[in-house]
Amino acid sequence: MSFNPDYESVAKAFIQHYYSKFDVGDGMSRAQGLSDLYDPENSYMTFEGQQAKGRDGILQKFTTLGFTKIQRAITVIDSQPLYDGSIQVMVLGQLKTDEDPINPFSQVFILRPNNQGSYFIGNEIFRLDLHNN
């Protein structure tokens, strides 16, 4: 395989789609909306230090998140093509859930090509950017 020359447009379209499905009111709707983006066995996620593997493990994590209202502002989306046709995506932004204060966040994705000519999330890391004072 080779580098995907359309990596930036793919990354931006993916992020718009992902957050439109993630930023819904309940965990079950969130999991249902995102299920097609994960591979049954070959997807990995670290969410605030907690790891999950495979579609079912990741979607289970999404159903247990305690918030119902999400407001998100994306500051920047950076992306790079990887040698095997994958795309690395990094998102920086701000996030407000329920009545919690606004917090900065970072999220990284590795989008892997699948056999249908599109992508699945191979790897994902999410962190609120909280610093000890």
UniProtKB/Swiss-Prot annotation:
Its transmembrane ranges are: none
Q: Main subcellular localization, coarse class?
A: cytoplasm
Q: Domain (NTF2): give its ranges.
A: 10-128
This protein's source sits in the domain of life called Eukaryota
PROSITE patterns linked: NTF2_DOMAIN
Q: List the disulfide bonds.
A: none
What molecular function does GO assign, one term?
nuclear import signal receptor activity
Name the job this protein performs: Facilitates protein transport into the nucleus. Could be part of a multicomponent system of cytosolic factors that assemble at the pore complex during nuclear import.
Q: What is this protein called?
A: Probable nuclear transport factor 2
Which organism was this protein described from?
Answer: Caenorhabditis elegans
| Lineage, highest ranks first | Eukaryota, Metazoa, Ecdysozoa, Nematoda, Chromadorea
